[in-house]
UniProtKB/Swiss-Prot annotation:
Highest classification ranks of the organism: Eukaryota, Viridiplantae, Streptophyta, Embryophyta, Tracheophyta
Family: Belongs to the TRAFAC class myosin-kinesin ATPase superfamily. Kinesin family. KIN-7 subfamily.
Targeting presequence: 1-96
Pfam family, one: zf-C3HC4_3
Protein name: Kinesin-like protein KIN-7D, mitochondrial
Cited InterPro entries: Kinesin-like_fam (IPR027640), Kinesin_motor_CS (IPR019821), Kinesin_motor_dom (IPR001752), Kinesin_motor_dom_sf (IPR036961), P-loop_NTPase (IPR027417), Znf_RING (IPR001841), Znf_RING/FYVE/PHD (IPR013083)
Region Disordered: start-end pairs: 1-36, 826-856, 926-963
Coiled coil: 419-503, 618-653, 694-823, 880-911
Gene name, Swiss-Prot/TrEMBL: KIN7D
Keywords: ATP-binding, Coiled coil, Metal-binding, Microtubule, Mitochondrion, Motor protein, Nucleotide-binding, Transit peptide, Zinc, Zinc-finger
Domain (Kinesin motor): residue spans on this chain: 98-415
ZnF (RING-type) ranges: 1008-1043
One Gene Ontology cellular component annotation held by this UniProt entry: microtubule
Compositional bias annotation for Low complexity: 1-23
């Protein structure tokens, strides 16, 4: 444990690559131009009306932004700064690259410490992950972070280059992958103390906008989740079960809601609202485990301002939090098990797609097998930069899951991508041309009015005057229409300009003399949004504190979200345009003052409420009270600034003439300042490089000193060994020889034991063959008995039918005799002799005595004899019916016994299939086991047992030999049961050995490892893992346990 933990503390020295790239980037910082026309603003904002676009999974990376962020290495190379410096080039750049893979270890949890888990995987340096118990098993990645690393460190390496390149027109995607409870959601979202990748990326986006003058930006966000293969819109609770569509640009989600964001707090408020609708649940590892994949998409549109405008650059930044794959260790049931099966299927499909892409062959890639892979199709197919963050746990209890995650990351590292910049070529370049033509025409018109054009005759002037009068009527109507259109256009410009974000850096107060009035007000409105952000960051001390305050406002106080949004939209900047202001602009400032006054009143009431509540919990409420007081002071300062602007607006018109000269001087000073800052940045970068080189030299010097000391110690040890007597060497060699002899003896004993076991198994197999032959003979005898019983049943049935016919006839005759006895008069004399003769003649047919007409009167029927004969027939009929019922009962018992024998036969087949797998393993360990004449003893044993059961039951059903049946059972049972018991005991021992050899075998191994519903029914080849049901084994192309390709499958019947 101590050795493994010490290995995690190693870190790589900072790379100078990022510092140089940052220096190149700052070279292209230019002052912002405020001469953007109204028509260009309309066209740039018109991109909002386009259809909803889904996150395009493409990625971009580049160096770090700003002059103060040096020494952070980029895991993969990115487009050069010279290419990124000219975003409006008609040629689209592309560069062959690979997916950036970063691995982050989380520390052991308290539960894992209590359970006694040890460190099974550890980071070996900055790029290697190595197994503790098998050091030869290692994986190399772009960057590996130990448990002590912070989320900011991970963001600087894995996500910051992607975010920066996305702001320059290259699509980017960052997603976290790992098993459940490995720290994916913590890495992507974080908390108040340690923000995650998504909050840091949002903050970085707005800081890049601040540092990029001369460009205007439009930001939109969308937030969706994939829950049980159903896409839901987290920003719109009514948007459920959305569909995925495809067009020329790639895949997108139809009907997804997109929101325009104006500040980091605004964007974080949408994330907080979406997280309230996300599906979470608890399991054995995590109290709040993610049950769905989420995709947060930031769409960026940017264009250059002023005369340099050439088109619009569009890019998408996708930040994905995948749900963790689950094993049977989570012990989920019901809905949680169903959710886990959907998560595992989507992640298994993602692994299959990554595997096929890593092969580089022209094969079918199953993107459509899952909603996740279909949405990631454009990213994985290589149209942008991709950054994969794999979160793993070092615990020994999850060693196999960690190994699978590392295999997945290693495959993803080999996928090639081609990052390219997106560009929207629209009609804006034509609008610029038209505007230049209009300006030249206006110049000519001014020259005509001043009479600067000579050589025009009186006749030409009269004709021109006549044409002018004719066109006045038409122009009047057109002018009215244009006025109406202009009013509508102005209102639309004011609305759309509020959504466009620009930088306030290097903006000069009052530099708006050549800009139209409405354009000046729009630019001021855009400046206000970001000036307020700068003021907040200056007051709070650092950008991180600003982000924490904004996230607190969006998460902790929902009632303040609307007021914060209004403050972001309407708060004035410290550098508001101070030129000649129109009454509309002054009214706008007055309205902003009123809104600020209302927000101050609302914040004051909130502060009073918090002060009242702080009596119960003063510690937690103290920070909120301080933040509110700071916010109230800031808004009061902004309101005073607005009032000062209103007062100074009148004075600005007087000093307008001299202000232009001052602005030119300030501009020249600003350019000089930029040059000096650039030189200073280069000097600081060189200084950092020299410091890094000095540190490297120092470390090399220390290593050389350590090597010298080590060599001196070895030299002393060698000299002492040479001086020691040779008897010690002999003693050591003798001890070593004794140890070798003991090992050889123990191995010989083990070999003898294995040979004895082998002989016993062969004897047991021969005994089982003999029993199979006996049981086969008994089965044939049982079949003969069954056929004889069937023939006898048929005979009995025919006899019963005959007896029933005779019974009906006798009943009819008895009824006729009774009728005759009632009609006849009683006779006085009885002839005894005749009666005896009549009784002897009744054994024949009675109808024959009725044939003689002359003796009919002398006929006398005895009803008692008839009753006795009828009773005898009834008794015989009852006996036959009871015999038939007994036969049917015996036949039912035979059927039940046959079904039970079939069930036992199936159970024996499964047991013997497992036994033969174990026998095959024994063959590999102890040598080839001789095959018994091409016969299958397992199959014979099953048949023999089933035949024995049939024979026992048939013999037991025989009515004449009950004693023989008991003797047969008692004789056969002692012969069979010991052999079967020995076989079962041997199989149980082999199973226990196999379970002990596997360090992390699943407790519920009889359940499918993908769907967690059906029992396992397939043995996968060549890995021989019995872990999937029949349907999942046909659907999967690789084993979910060891990730090896499935070449064939053996299906078994569950017992």
């Amino acid at each position: 444990m101590a050795s493994s933990s010490s290995r995690t503390r190693s870190s790589r020295p900072p790379s100078p690559a990022s510092s140089t790239s940052s220096s190149h980037l700052s070279n292209r910082l230019i002052p912002r131009s405020n001469s953007t026309s109204a028509s260009s603003l309309i066209t740039s904002a018109a991109g909002i009306a386009s259809r909803s676009m889904t996150p395009s999974r493409t990625f971009s990376d580049s160096g770090l932004i700003g002059s103060g962020s040096f020494g952070i290495g980029s895991p993969v190379p990115y487009p050069s700064e010279e290419l990124l410096g000219d975003p409006m080039d008609d040629t689209i750049s592309s560069e062959r690259d690979s997916i950036s893979v970063t691995v982050r270890f989380r520390p052991l949890s308290d539960r894992e410490y209590q359970r006694g888990d040890e460190v099974a995987w550890y980071p070996d340096g900055d790029t290697l992950v190595r197994h503790e118990y098998n050091p030869l098993t290692a994986y190399a990645f772009d960057k590996v972070f130990g448990p002590q690393a912070t989320t900011i460190d991970v963001y600087d390496v894995a996500a910051r280059p992607v975010v920066k390149a996305a702001m320059e027109g290259v699509n980017g995607t960052v997603f976290a992958y790992g098993v459940t409870s490995s720290g994916k959601t913590h890495t992507m979202h974080g908390d108040q103390e340690s923000p995650g990748i998504i909050p840091l990326a949002i903050k970085d986006v707005f800081s890049i906008i601040q540092d990029t003058p001369g460009r205007e930006f439009l930001l939109r966000v969308s937030y969706l989740e994939i829950y049980n293969e159903v896409i839901n819109d987290l920003l719109d609770p009514t948007g459920q079960n959305l569909r995925v569509r495809e067009d020329s640009q790639g895949t997108y989600v139809e009907g997804i809601k997109e929101e325009v964001v104006l500040s980091p707090g605004h964007a974080l408020s949408f994330i907080a609202a979406g997280e309230e609708h996300r599906h979470v649940g608890s399991n054995n590892f995590n109290l709040l485990s993610s049950r769905s994949h989420t995709i947060f998409t930031l769409m960026v549109e940017s264009s250059a301002t002023g005369d340099e405008y050439d088109g619009v650059i569009f890019s998408q930044l996708n930040l994905i939090d995948l749900a963790g794959s689950e094993s049977s260790k989570t012990e989920t049931t019901g809905l949680r098990r169903k959710e886990g099966s959907y998560i595992n299927k989507s992640l298994l499909t993602l692994g299959t797609v990554i595997g096929k892409l890593s092969e580089g062959k022209a094969t079918h890639i199953p993107y459509r097998d899952s909603k996740l892979t279909r949405l990631l199709q454009s990213s994985l197919s290589g149209h942008g930069h991709v950054s994969l963050i794999c979160t793993i746990t070092p615990a020994s209890s999850s060693s196999e899951e960690t190994h699978n995650t590392l295999k997945f990351a290693s495959r993803a590292k080999s996928i090639e991508i081609y990052a390219s910049r997106n560009q929207i070529i629209d009609e804006k370049s034509l609008i610029k041309k038209y505007q230049r033509e209009i300006s030249t025409l206006k110049l000519e018109l001014d020259q005509l009015r001043r009479g600067m054009l000579v050589g025009v005759s009186h006749e030409e002037l009269m004709s021109l005057k006549q044409q002018l009068e004719e066109g006045q009527v038409k122009m009047q109507s057109r002018l009215e229409e244009e006025e109406e259109a202009k009013a509508a256009l102005m209102s639309r410009i004011q609305k759309l300009t509020k959504l466009i974000l620009v930088s306030t850096k290097n903006s000069i107060p009052g530099y708006s003399g050549d800009i139209p009035t409405h354009q000046r007000s729009l630019s001021a409105g855009k400046d206000d949004k970001f000036d307020s952000l700068l003021l907040e960051s200056d007051n709070l001390g650092s950008p991180s504190s600003t982000l924490a305050l904004l996230s607190e406002g969006s998460l902790g106080f929902n009632h303040r979200r609307s007021s914060s949004k209004l403050n972001d939209e309407n708060s004035p900047g410290a550098e508001f345009t101070q030129g000649v202001m129109t009454p509309d602009e002054i009214d706008l400032l007055v309205e902003q003052v009123k809104m600020l006054a209302g927000e101050i009143a609302f914040s004051t009431s909130t502060l009073k409420r918090l002060v009242d509540q702080s009596v119960n919990d003063p510690e937690n409420s103290q920070t909120q009270i301080q933040n509110l007081e700071r916010e109230i002071h800031e808004k009061q300062r902004q309101m005073r600034g607005l009032e000062q602007l209103i007062i100074e607006s009148g004075e600005a018109s007087i000093a307008n003439a001299s202000l232009v000269e001052m602005q030119q001087k300030v501009m020249s000073l600003m350019t000089q300042c930029n040059e000096k800052s650039f030189e200073l940045e280069i000097k600081s970068a060189d200084n950092c490089i020299l410091q890094e080189q000095l540190q490297e030299k120092c470390t090399e010097n220390k290593e050389l000193h350590e090597k010298v000391n080590l060599l001196e110690q070895r030299l002393n040890a060698v000299s002492s060994e040479k001086s020691s007597p040779s008897c010690s060497n002999k003693a050591v060699s003798g001890e070593y020889a004794d140890e070798l002899k003991k090992k050889i003896q123990s191995q010989e004993i083990e070999n003898e034991e294995l040979k004895l076991e082998h002989v016993q198994i062969v004897e047991e197999n021969s005994g089982l063959r003999v029993q199979n032959q006996k049981l086969a003979e008994e089965a044939s005898y049982a079949k003969e008995l069954a056929s004889a019983a069937a023939v006898e049943l048929k005979n009995l049935a025919s006899e019963v039918t005959k007896l029933s016919l005779q019974n009906t006839k006798l009943e009819k005759e008895l009824a006729a005799a009774r009728d005759l006895a009632q009609t006849r008069n009683p006779m006085n004399g009885v002839n005894r002799k005749y009666n005896d003769g009549a009784r002897s003649g009744r054994k024949g047919r009675i109808s024959s005595s009725r044939s003689s007409g002359d003796e009919f009167d002398a006929w006398n029927l005895d009803p008692e004899d008839l009753k006795m004969e009828l009773q005898v027939r009834k008794q015989r009929e009852v006996a036959l019916e009871s015999a038939l019922a007994e036969k049917e009962f015996i036949e039912d018992e035979y059927r039940k016994k046959a079904e039970e024998a079939k069930r036992r036969e199936e159970a024996l087949e499964n047991d013997l299939a497992n036994m033969w797998v174990l026998v095959a393993k024994l063959k590999k360990d102890n040598g080839a086991l001789p095959e018994p004449n091409g016969t299958d003893p397992g199959r014979e044993l099953e048949k023999s047992q089933s035949h024995a059961v049939l024979k026992e039951r048939q013999v037991s059903s025989a009515p004449r030999q009950p004693e023989v049946v008991v003797v047969a059972k008692t004789e056969e049972t002692p012969k069979e049961e010991p052999l079967v018991a020995r076989l079962k005991a041997r199989m149980q021992e082999m199973k226990e050995k196999e379970m002990k050899s596997q360090a992390n075998g699943d407790a519920n191994s009889h359940i499918c490892k993908v769907c967690f519903e059906s029992p396992t029914a397939a043995i996968l080849l060549p890995c021989r893992h019995f872990c999937l049901c029949k349907s999942c084994s046909l659907a999967c192309s690789e084993c979910p346990i060891c990730r090896t390709k499935i070449s064939d499958r053996l299906f078994a019947f569950p017992s």
